[in-house]
Amino acid sequence: MTNFNESVWVTTAVKKEQFPESDAIEIVLSGRSNVGKSSCINAICEKKAMAYVGKRPGKTRYLNFFKVNDQLWLVDVPGYGFAQRSQTELKSYGILMEDYFNTRKQCKACLLVIDSRHGLTADDQDMLDYILEKNYPYRIVATKCDKLTYSKKLAIKKELEGLYGADCVILFSALSKEGRVDLQKWCASQIDETR
């Protein structure tokens, strides 16, 4: 049994030389800016403020590594689609992401975090295409689902599963904790499935 509440922040990396040494598998949380990736990490790990949650989009600008245990780490990556970044920042973000995905053999699975109220955006679709191209196991995490009616929750789940297959979506709310156990189970299952 994986004890997520024993998770700890390990380090922040600005460039690939700062990626930490580890034999654990890594699950990346990717998504647009301000979609709830940090809140998702905090909920998975049963901590209130392990990952910084910013009020403004674009606060996570580097890779943040979180150790769940010796076999599993979570990686919070900068959000995409935030227009108020300079060209220099966008270029360094692109290099950092390429370095991570192309050189980090520990990266074994992805959680694509989307805002359930907006569905899959064009940027999300691009990221999902990349995940599929890399052949990573994945789940689409539809956050902020506490703001949707029951019928709208069912509709987004049905729509995405119709496109990408059964069980590809986890409805999630950091507020109500809906979906947290499903996320924890899926993350823990990747330890054996991706080794």
PLM features: residue spans?
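Canonical P-loop GTPase G-domain recognition
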Residues: 4-16, 147-195
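Conserved nucleotide-sensing/catalytic segment adjacent to the nucleotide-binding pocket
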Residues: 69-107
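Helical mechanochemical/support elements of P-loop NTPase systems and associated helical scaffolds
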Residues: 49, 62, 73, 89-93, ...
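Conserved nucleotide-binding/hydrolysis micro-motifs of P-loop NTPases
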Residues: 59, 72, 79-82, 117-119, ...
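Conserved G1/Walker A P-loop phosphate-binding module
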Residues: 1-84
